[in-house]
């Protein structure tokens, strides 16, 4: 039977990672995979995470199952981190998941359980795995305009016009902050206009919050999500702990379902636990316990916030350096968008041919749509990238 399987196209980003590893050149630069790296190219374990694990090692007495929906302390801590004072526990269902991707998948499954004819609106462009998962599930996908290729900013008028076509029973996937792959983000005033459109259409928002703390700060990065939560009666939020806690391999994520009333919350919580049971039963515990320990221990939380702020400000500094280098080489401000974008990524606007030349001639690897991982740069590689960008004619 297994001989009937068809070959699957490899994930382009993961294939690029393999190609980079096979490249024998000493000066090669990896700007492809979306993983934070420090100035030495290392993805470190955060100090507070180390300390939390040490506490767990000393105090844990069992490895038995936790609940189907996850550890209550983790659920509460994540709800408060994301929604702040706006968290309404009596109407919020919470699910621990296998990473942010698991949260996205369970959110889609939950919405499809509620509406078998679910249609999903996604930004053009979006994280490729969004569409891949939806296609695999057989869900109809509709794109809405988002990125302006000329300004490298948000095409907000196009976005509004396209989202106005959504209907009650549709889902609208929004990036909570640090848009992947473009780095172009909505202002709070623009979030308010999106909320007005959602109020009119009755569409269900699903907010992908994978990079809270990587853009303008923990509170600032959650502002759009909180605004939507304050105005729309039903909201799904898929959050990842991979980036802001640096626990990529622990696969720690969370799904919040904001409901109109307590009775609906009970229905959603039961359905979400059911989905976990049908998929993998109990969610991973170790990463969730790390997160809850950090967030509920004042000294660990303070140290985590300080280290996360250093990561965030470091990426902003790299953005400003790259934009400045490109300004000097080009004699113009046409690359100013690099400094304005937020998060790990920026889309440069290079053609596939230019991306290929940059890889072949300079040993610099980026995704085919010219998305670069800002965190993959350092003081030494920024001038090399800037020169490559100018020389290939971006």
Swiss-Prot record:
<keyword id="KW-0032">Aminotransferase</keyword>
<dbReference type="InterPro" id="IPR004839">
    <property type="entry name" value="Aminotransferase_I/II_large"/>
</dbReference>
<feature type="binding site">
    <location>
        <position position="127"/>
    </location>
    <ligand>
        <name>substrate</name>
    </ligand>
</feature>
<keyword id="KW-0808">Transferase</keyword>
<dbReference type="GO" id="GO:0042802">
    <property type="term" value="F:identical protein binding"/>
</dbReference>
<protein>
    <recommendedName>
        <fullName>Aromatic-amino-acid aminotransferase</fullName>
        <ecNumber>2.6.1.57</ecNumber>
    </recommendedName>
</protein>
<feature type="binding site">
    <location>
        <position position="180"/>
    </location>
    <ligand>
        <name>substrate</name>
    </ligand>
</feature>
<dbReference type="InterPro" id="IPR000796">
    <property type="entry name" value="Asp_trans"/>
</dbReference>
<keyword id="KW-0028">Amino-acid biosynthesis</keyword>
<comment type="subunit">
    <text>Homodimer.</text>
</comment>
<feature type="binding site">
    <location>
        <position position="34"/>
    </location>
    <ligand>
        <name>substrate</name>
    </ligand>
</feature>
<keyword id="KW-0663">Pyridoxal phosphate</keyword>
<dbReference type="GO" id="GO:0005829">
    <property type="term" value="C:cytosol"/>
</dbReference>
<dbReference type="GO" id="GO:0004069">
    <property type="term" value="F:L-aspartate:2-oxoglutarate aminotransferase activity"/>
</dbReference>
<keyword id="KW-0963">Cytoplasm</keyword>
<comment type="function">
    <text>Shows activities toward both dicarboxylic and aromatic substrates.</text>
</comment>
<feature type="binding site">
    <location>
        <position position="371"/>
    </location>
    <ligand>
        <name>substrate</name>
    </ligand>
</feature>
<keyword id="KW-0057">Aromatic amino acid biosynthesis</keyword>
<dbReference type="InterPro" id="IPR015421">
    <property type="entry name" value="PyrdxlP-dep_Trfase_major"/>
</dbReference>
<dbReference type="GO" id="GO:0030170">
    <property type="term" value="F:pyridoxal phosphate binding"/>
</dbReference>
<dbReference type="Pfam" id="PF00155">
    <property type="entry name" value="Aminotran_1_2"/>
</dbReference>
<dbReference type="InterPro" id="IPR015422">
    <property type="entry name" value="PyrdxlP-dep_Trfase_small"/>
</dbReference>
<dbReference type="GO" id="GO:0004838">
    <property type="term" value="F:L-tyrosine-2-oxoglutarate transaminase activity"/>
</dbReference>
<dbReference type="InterPro" id="IPR015424">
    <property type="entry name" value="PyrdxlP-dep_Trfase"/>
</dbReference>
<dbReference type="GO" id="GO:0033585">
    <property type="term" value="P:L-phenylalanine biosynthetic process from chorismate via phenylpyruvate"/>
</dbReference>
<comment type="similarity">
    <text>Belongs to the class-I pyridoxal-phosphate-dependent aminotransferase family.</text>
</comment>
<feature type="modified residue" description="N6-(pyridoxal phosphate)lysine">
    <location>
        <position position="243"/>
    </location>
</feature>
<feature type="binding site">
    <location>
        <position position="65"/>
    </location>
    <ligand>
        <name>substrate</name>
    </ligand>
</feature>
